[in-house]
UniProtKB/Swiss-Prot annotation:
<comment type="function">
    <text>Acts as a chaperone.</text>
</comment>
<comment type="similarity">
    <text>Belongs to the heat shock protein 70 family.</text>
</comment>
<feature type="modified residue" description="Phosphothreonine; by autocatalysis">
    <location>
        <position position="174"/>
    </location>
</feature>
<keyword id="KW-0346">Stress response</keyword>
<dbReference type="GO" id="GO:0005524">
    <property type="term" value="F:ATP binding"/>
</dbReference>
<dbReference type="InterPro" id="IPR029047">
    <property type="entry name" value="HSP70_peptide-bd_sf"/>
</dbReference>
<dbReference type="InterPro" id="IPR018181">
    <property type="entry name" value="Heat_shock_70_CS"/>
</dbReference>
<dbReference type="InterPro" id="IPR029048">
    <property type="entry name" value="HSP70_C_sf"/>
</dbReference>
<dbReference type="InterPro" id="IPR043129">
    <property type="entry name" value="ATPase_NBD"/>
</dbReference>
<dbReference type="GO" id="GO:0051082">
    <property type="term" value="F:unfolded protein binding"/>
</dbReference>
<dbReference type="InterPro" id="IPR012725">
    <property type="entry name" value="Chaperone_DnaK"/>
</dbReference>
<dbReference type="InterPro" id="IPR013126">
    <property type="entry name" value="Hsp_70_fam"/>
</dbReference>
<protein>
    <recommendedName>
        <fullName>Chaperone protein DnaK</fullName>
    </recommendedName>
</protein>
<feature type="region of interest" description="Disordered">
    <location>
        <begin position="589"/>
        <end position="628"/>
    </location>
</feature>
<dbReference type="GO" id="GO:0140662">
    <property type="term" value="F:ATP-dependent protein folding chaperone"/>
</dbReference>
<keyword id="KW-0143">Chaperone</keyword>
<feature type="compositionally biased region" description="Gly residues">
    <location>
        <begin position="591"/>
        <end position="605"/>
    </location>
</feature>
Amino acid sequence: MGKIIGIDLGTTNSCVAVMEGGKPVVIANAEGLRTTPSVVAFSKTGERLVGDPAKRQAVTNADKTISSIKRHMGTDYKVEIDGKKYTPQEISAMILQKLKSDAENYLGEKVTEAVITVPAYFNDAQRQATKDAGKIAGLDVKRIINEPTAAALAYGLDNEHEQKIMVYDLGGGTFDVSIIEIGDGVIEVLATAGNNKLGGDDFDNAVTQYMLNDFKAKEGVDLSKDTMALQRLKEAAEKAKKELSSTTQTEINLPYITATAEGPKHFEMTLTRAKFDELTHDLVEKTAEPVKNALSDAGLTASELSKVLLVGGSTRIPAVQDKVKSLTGHEPSKTLNPDECVAIGASIQGGKLAGDAGAGDILLLDVTPLSLSIETMGGIATRLIERNTTIPTKKSQIFSTAADNQTAVDINVVQGERQFARDNKSLGQFRLDGIPPARRGVPQIEVTFDIDANGIVNVSAKDLGTGKEQHITITAGSNMSDEDIDKAVKEAAEFEAQDKKRKDAIDARNEADSMVFQTQKAMDEAGDKLDASDKAAVETDLNALKALVDGSDPENMTDAQVDEIKAAKEKLMESAQKLFAKLYESQQAAGGAGPDMGAGAGPDMGAGASNGSAPYGDDVVDGDYKEV
């Protein structure tokens, strides 16, 4: 069985880990970093960028850069780029593809399976959208698990003594708090609460708005309509937020932020931690109610907790840590890396599903975060499954008709805690027809809710009189049809193929460029020891290859150009081999050592060679790079 990777698909940053040698390992991305910005961009040439390359160019390409797409999962939101509309699932799939590719490069094998985490307070539509994103990215999502639960799994792997902990998870876009009991090889979620619209992005926005207001007051210029200036302000706000976690004030300097008739304008500000705390006070306060609700639902007081774990980058904010301490009376534990522990927990679950002994025998018991109901007469939301019910679970209830001779019933499935169906999230509607005419209240219709281990809901209705049954077909606009998903899968595969093709083209060009340099270097070192006629042939081939390399754009090479470069490289390799073989033979006959030309008897062009064989290696990789 292949490896099952664990992915923390975050609002602002994502992370991937895997079980290796019985231990969870965080996988560094192609840029050498352990987390990847959840940012996707399309360059002016149409190239797709994901992660750090996408984030770096956001200032100059704000209109085609997409961030925090996770906040739109499970909705009918679409982003339009170059005339094409993308769903949140498709954009998320691009991030997942990047993480998948990084994992494959690390493991040296194909990866097709994953465990992906979601905020505990994600509803059914958001969970299904996450699963669809995985499918589009070419991943079989073996399990969807809640982020706080994953963090507890990472913590509980080495801490199995009995304890009750709180996981306080404040990420880039969402907030979750879970009360979890650990002991006897079981990790059981007792209760969960949260806010899907609260996270680090909101802290950044508060600072950005303050900066906008300050500049407008001082200079009379509204920067909110200037996309490039606004992007610079947002990046500066995020940087300032991070710096204020370790210092009491920071300087924000953005030269040439805009220009007026009077000339260029510069943005300068000193932001103190006290001012930052004032700007974000209401956001920190919003975490209090979910904490109280989770404790209440778990039937515990804060004093009964053994520990409070901090998860998510936003928990580094000192005011957040102070709030946690005031709410719980506990000094929050910093045992876990808040950026990586969720991915680590997901990889442990992946290892468990793959049969990895290092994942241990921990049993994971999670809960559904929101109550599930159907709409009954008067628009009432009649609950079948209460929130914080351990999953997987199944519950059935008998309902009947509301009018005489009613032959069909429309069933509206809702998720949430409000008393009326209209105030909750509708998961979908379906109709059970063919009910024999009868007096009101006579037909018996059994409605069954089935929540799987991923927290995804399946609903069916059965007429017990006729045996006729109907399963739910989600009609909410946020869900992609099977046809849409299949189409997106194909497009994602095409993008992957395009990316590989582009990389192969750049590799071919770089190898050719390296060969031109190394051959010229070796010829210069050998000087007049080379046979004149053979040297002329090599110079002709070298110049031909150099012209092809110089005349190609590494970002936009055609197949014909790549083939030409490869053919010219082979031709140069052949003539150079002949030239340096002759030189080697003449030096051997004369008993001389010849010029210093690397490990073998030829120029220093990769893997050395002996006995007149070519000193070239096909796997030479040029160290030059271009930063985008």
